[in-house]
């Protein structure tokens, strides 16, 4: 299964320094020259954006220039830390310390069905607590929030309600605009410029529930290791994944590259789902539609329908269960995958996933 392996340490990424005095001309000048920012400068820029002191042109220039330069893990970590500091806080006493998130950067341009959304429900039904962070579609026809809404889940719950959902149902959804109101200006700019930027990396890194484990999809192969580096500095157990067909998911059309984050280190692996008996799918078999179409697909898969979409959902759900198992230093790679795949399949075939969705819908509508 593992064709190649490379390791790096979170210690390679220096901690962010106090935010220095800076200016947009100084900062943008460095970026357009291809130079890394000084420690604290990325944090300064994000502080300007989140506080509403940055103009739209400055936000757009920064977002694009940072991605073109290729950010460091330290720079992205500063952006995420400032964004989290502005987020609506979750009730810490009600949030378990072993939650998992399943989310991607978006931006792969493929418009697949909402695999991570379906996988989240399966993982929760398998007994792993899930706090999913997500938003409406930015470039595809339906984002995770759009599909959940079409399924009947109320997506605009606040911190206390999400915490209750997690504790009573086993899953909660943090709708990004509800928890990151100060990010509104950057969201508008991101939609207007219409191309992936450094901001695509921030969604998976800024879940306000701060889950310690996750299956994190990255559509950008050159940036996935940077995301993994940020998670490593946090001591997370995460699989950052990039389908070698370009998907920000574990794919079944070919191999995937995985950056496994555990105990502060990052290992790069090549993962072949065929090693676990998965048939190769065609990308066209994983394509989605509008929210109603994706919701119908989700109901079918959670109801037990076989086929390429189910395979991809089971694979991604298993990946999240593997990441969750990584919170224990005793977790072993192959046994964890075997366990995760079995638990994901049973969660669907037993009806547990379908039943959990029904309970979640009822809870969210009456909380």
Swiss-Prot record:
Anthranilate 1 binds at residues 104, 135. Its cofactor is Mg(2+). Its EC number is 2.4.2.18. Pathway: Amino-acid biosynthesis; L-tryptophan biosynthesis; L-tryptophan from chorismate: step 2/5. Binds 2 magnesium ions per monomer. Catalyzes the transfer of the phosphoribosyl group of 5-phosphorylribose-1-pyrophosphate (PRPP) to anthranilate to yield N-(5'-phosphoribosyl)-anthranilate (PRA). Belongs to the anthranilate phosphoribosyltransferase family. It catalyses: N-(5-phospho-beta-D-ribosyl)anthranilate + diphosphate = 5-phospho-alpha-D-ribose 1-diphosphate + anthranilate. 5-phospho-alpha-D-ribose 1-diphosphate binds at residues 104, 107-108, 112, 114-117, 132-140, 144. The gene is trpD. This is Anthranilate phosphoribosyltransferase. Residues 1-17 have a biased composition (Low complexity). HAMAP family: TrpD. InterPro entries: Anthranilate_Pribosyl_Tfrase, Glycosyl_Trfase_fam3, Glycosyl_Trfase_fam3_N_dom, Glycosyl_Trfase_fam3_N_dom_sf, Nuc_phospho_transferase. GO terms for molecular function: anthranilate phosphoribosyltransferase activity; magnesium ion binding. Homodimer. Residues 1-22 are annotated as: Disordered. GO terms for biological process: L-tryptophan biosynthetic process. Anthranilate 2 binds at residue 190. It holds the Pfam family Glycos_transf_3. Keywords: Amino-acid biosynthesis, Aromatic amino acid biosynthesis, Glycosyltransferase, Magnesium, Metal-binding, Transferase, Tryptophan biosynthesis. SUPFAM superfamilies: Nucleoside phosphorylase/phosphoribosyltransferase catalytic domain, Nucleoside phosphorylase/phosphoribosyltransferase N-terminal domain. GO terms for cellular component: cytosol.
């Amino acid at each position: 299964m593992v064709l190649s392996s490379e390791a790096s340490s979170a210690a390679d990424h220096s901690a962010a320094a106090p935010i220095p005095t800076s200016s947009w001309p100084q900062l943008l000048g460095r970026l357009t020259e291809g130079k890394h920012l000084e420690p604290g400068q990325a944090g300064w820029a994000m502080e300007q954006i989140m506080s509403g002191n940055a103009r739209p042109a400055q936000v757009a220039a920064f977002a694009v220039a940072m991605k073109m330069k290729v950010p460091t893990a330290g720079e992205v970590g500063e952006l995420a830390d400032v964004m989290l500091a502005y987020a609506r806080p979750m009730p810490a006493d009600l949030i378990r310390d072993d939650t998992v998130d399943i989310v991607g950067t978006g931006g792969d341009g493929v418009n697949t069905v909402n695999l991570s959304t379906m996988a989240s429900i399966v993982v929760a039904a398998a007994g792993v607590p899930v706090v999913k962070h997500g938003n409406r579609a930015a470039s595809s026809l339906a984002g995770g929030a759009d599909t959940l809404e079409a399924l009947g889940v109320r997506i605009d719950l606040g911190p206390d309600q999400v915490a209750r959902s997690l504790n009573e149902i086993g899953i909660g959804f943090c709708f990004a605009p509800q928890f990151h109101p100060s990010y509104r200006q950057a969201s508008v700019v991101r939609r207007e410029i219409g191309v992936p930027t450094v901001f695509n990396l921030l969604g998976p890194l800024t879940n306000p529930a701060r889950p310690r484990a996750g299956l994190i999809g990255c559509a950008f192969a050159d940036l996935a290791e940077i995301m993994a580096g940020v998670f490593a500095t946090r001591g997370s157990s995460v699989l950052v994944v990039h389908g070698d067909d370009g998907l920000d998911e574990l794919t079944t059309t070919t191999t995937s590259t995985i950056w496994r984050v555990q105990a502060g280190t990052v290992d790069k692996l090549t993962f072949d789902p065929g090693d676990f008996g998965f048939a190769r799918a065609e990308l066209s078999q994983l394509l989605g539609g509008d929210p109603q179409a994706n919701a119908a697909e989700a109901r079918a898969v959670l109801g037990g329908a076989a086929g390429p979409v189910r395979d991809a959902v089971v694979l991604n759900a298993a990946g999240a269960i593997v990441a969750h198992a990584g919170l224990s230093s005793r977790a072993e790679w192959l046994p964890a995958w075997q366990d995760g795949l079995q638990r994901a399949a049973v969660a669907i075939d037993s009806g547990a996933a379908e039943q959990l969705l029904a309970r979640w819908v009822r809870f969210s509508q009456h909380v």
